[in-house]
């Protein structure tokens, strides 16, 4: 099964995937969207793809927020009250919790896109998490966002590159050892021939992602490790006496600038 067949199969068999796409399609050009995402590599890559998706599909601007805590709270959402009412709140890569329904008291439409094991299922929020009801493990939220873009017909090379990075960041596959989560394999087989240079294996210093073979690494592993360090950049401020922006925002803005060039490193 190739990647496009996997996306089509998921659309046929997973009603949550279909509902997520219908939610995006239901937005208008003047819609306001707020996205809370995890602050790790997978979360920042997901935030970028969601921002990119909404801009490309409907010309919709998205406010992206990546709080330091994993679980989203009602207070986090309330802090954006001054921004007015949002038409859609997307919670990406921040877990699936039953009490996320509390957020619906202040946000009329909530879509959760996540790949973690659910800690109870919300009844009001819309949830796209292939792990719900003990279904297949989805490997990375970035991949789920890329699948939505693919079904909408708006994914391109920069999205492929960012998705590969997000998948590597959450250990969906290992370029050096060849190990790969089954759910991510169709994407890996699709993206490898499209961007072969990032899958090059080199005999250089191993990265944090080289857990199987410490004698070599891959270009994608090196890039992802740099991005991981970028998400932590704000923690270096005291050591270097610098005013460094919040790491996840720094990385997201870099991705946006990268997408505007139409090229990747």
What does each model-found stretch correspond to?
Residues 194-225:
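A conserved active-site cap/scaffold subdomain adjacent to cofactor or substrate pockets
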């Amino acid at each position: 099964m190739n990647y496009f067949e996997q996306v089509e199969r998921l659309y046929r068999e997973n009603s949550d995937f279909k509902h997520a796409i219908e939610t995006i399609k239901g937005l208008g050009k003047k819609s306001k969207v707020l996205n809370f995402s995890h602050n790790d590599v997978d979360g920042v890559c997901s935030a970028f793809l969601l921002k990119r998706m909404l801009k490309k599909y409907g010309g919709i601007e998205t406010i992206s927020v990546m709080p330091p805590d994993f679980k989203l709270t009602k207070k986090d959402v309330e802090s954006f009250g001054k921004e007015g009412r949002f038409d859609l709140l997307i919670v990406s890569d921040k877990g699936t919790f039953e009490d996320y329904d509390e957020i619906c008291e202040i946000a009329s439409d909530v879509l959760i896109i996540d790949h973690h094991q659910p800690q109870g299922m919300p009844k009001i929020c819309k949830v796209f998490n292939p792990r719900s009801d003990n279904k297949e493990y989805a490997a990375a939220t970035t991949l789920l966002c890329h699948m939505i873009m693919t079904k909408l017909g708006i994914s391109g090379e920069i999205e492929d590159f960012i998705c590969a990075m997000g998948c590597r960041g959450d250990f969906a596959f290992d370029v050096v050892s060849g190990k790969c989560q089954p759910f991510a394999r169709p994407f890996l087989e699709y993206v490898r021939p499209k961007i072969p240079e990032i899958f090059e294996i080199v005999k250089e210093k191993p990265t944090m992602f080289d857990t199987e073979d410490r004698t070599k690494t891959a270009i994608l592993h090196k890039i992802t490790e740099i991005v991981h360090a970028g998400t932590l950049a704000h923690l270096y401020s005291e050591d270097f006496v610098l005013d460094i922006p919040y790491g996840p925002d720094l990385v997201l803005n870099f991705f946006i600038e990268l997408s505007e060039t139409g090229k990747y490193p």
